[in-house]
Structure formats: structure tokens, C-alpha cells
């Protein structure tokens, strides 16, 4: 699923996204090959803190690399969703279950 991501999808619900969970923190990159939806991506550390946010442009095959090697999660959402919801680098994300780490373990 990591490799396919949002490829070939034509819609994504307004307040949904795709969370990628990595086995350990590292530097990573995402591209938009075969992806026609404009997306934004947040690179997130193991403490659920947003490190970096980027806009991803449809069909762009150049990877958008993280600058940090502390990326534990990546969250893809509709482009502009982070800004509309006041999420920026430094924001700590959580779900109804708690931190991203707690939420992922609960699944």
C-alpha cells in the first residue's frame, strides 16, 4: 500500500487521508506518479509532532524528500487541508484514541 498510496484514486473524502507508518524513523520521500489528486503531505516524528508539510502536485514524478531523518509517519490529505485546519510544523497530532503511536497500536 505504501508504494501505491493514492495512485489511480479519483477522490478522497474531505476530512480523510492516508497515514503511512514506518518501522523506524528515517528520511523519506513521496512522489505523485499516477496520482491526479492535489495533495498535501505532513512528515511526522515518533512523538506525533509535525516536522514538515509540503504540497504535492498531480502527476509529478519528482519525489518530495523530507529534510529530517526523524520521520516515523507521513500523512497525505487533500491539498490545503493542513492550512485550513491550523496544522503547521510543531503541531502535535492525536486521534480519539490518543497519539498517533497509540492509535496505530490499537488498530
Model-derived features: positions:
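Compact, glycine-rich, soluble single-domain proteins
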Residues: 1-107
Amino acid at each position: 500500500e505504501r508504494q501505491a498510496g493514492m495512485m489511480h484514486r479519483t477522490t478522497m473524502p474531505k476530512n480523510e487521508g492516508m497515514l503511512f507508518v514506518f518501522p523506524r524513523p528515517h528520511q523519506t520521500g513521496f512522489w505523485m506518479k499516477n496520482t491526479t489528486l492535489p495533495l498535501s503531505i505532513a512528515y511526522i516524528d515518533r512523538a506525533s509532532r509535525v516536522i514538515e508539510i509540503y504540497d504535492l502536485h498531480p502527476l509529478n514524478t519528482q519525489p518530495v524528500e523530507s529534510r529530517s531523518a526523524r520521520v516515523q509517519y507521513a500523512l497525505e490529505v487533500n491539498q490545503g487541508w493542513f492550512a485550513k485546519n491550523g496544522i503547521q510544523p510543531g503541531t502535535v497530532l492525536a486521534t480519539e484514541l490518543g497519539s498517533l503511536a497509540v492509535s496505530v497500536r490499537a488498530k
